[in-house]
Amino acid sequence: MKKTLILAAAAALVSSTAFAQTPRAVDVKDIVELELLTHSEVTQKIKEGKTSVLLVTGGTEERGPHNVLGGHTIMSRHRAVEIAKRLGNALVAPILPIAVAATGVSEGTNTPGGLQVPADVFKGVQLAMIESISYSGFKDIYVMGDHGGGQAQIQEAVKEMDAKLSPKGVHVYYINDFYQKTHDDVDMYMYEHKLPIAGHGAMMETSEMLYEEPVPGMYVRPIYKTVPFNPTGQTPEQWKAARDARAARQAAMAAGNAPPAAAGGGRGQRGQDPNAPPRVDNGLTGDPRPSTKEIGKVVFEIGVNNTIAEIKKQTAQRRGSQD
């Protein structure tokens, strides 16, 4: 009798566990990714008011020994989905996983796996994506990229396609804050919290992917806590001075004045840190070791909020100019 009761209890436990693990059925109302919708579902969503679409470029390149190659694409997808959901009237086109000037792409590279296309080809792809998605019935197309390479071509393509499509009632926008302002704001957050600033595959990207990965180790390997890295070649104070100088130049130019002389350093222009350790050349620049999911959430929110703010600002300006 006792054995029978034990077996019955075990069977009940297995049954309840299996039931608890049964995945929840997909609710199409929650889906904003075009690639996960049928064409009839897209038609219905547009009728319901989702007349905006996000066209986002990610990228495939080395990000150090600890981060997966598709980091730009992964982060772009997570941010874009959240942006669309918060906007409430937008869908997300498939993320383009190839950009211009990917890091580590050269003959005989010791950091394999990267993909890139020439600038003119990339611009042509942007033009084609914008035009083809305009056929679907979207009224506002927001174009952006998470990779520095290709920003100029995205901007050029947006300008050309907006001029072509605006007479048809379709407007195209270049959302630079998805990339540039987000990097600047994240760098400032790191500076204010005395964390490592900037780099490639370092604090910003590692923390954000730790926050986004569905299971530990999928996007960021555990070795990030001990991995050797190349220094950025810049102290925090050198970074701050370069940032302030760049802001002063931008303000002067916006006011129509002659900009002050450029200072050394800044993102992409490194002042020299005389105490920097020797290079290890493993594809990683900057220190990722203090990265956490909590910092990643901050980075994620900065990117999402900056993008939403610029989308709303540009859309309001366009609507106002039409009144």
For the regions a language model picked out, list residue spans one by one.
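Extended, histidine- and acidic-residue-enriched regions that form the cofactor-binding/catalytic faces
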Residues: 21-142, 146-323
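Bacterial N-terminal signal peptides
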Residues: 8-17
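Bacterial N-terminal signal peptides that target proteins for export
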Residues: 1-7
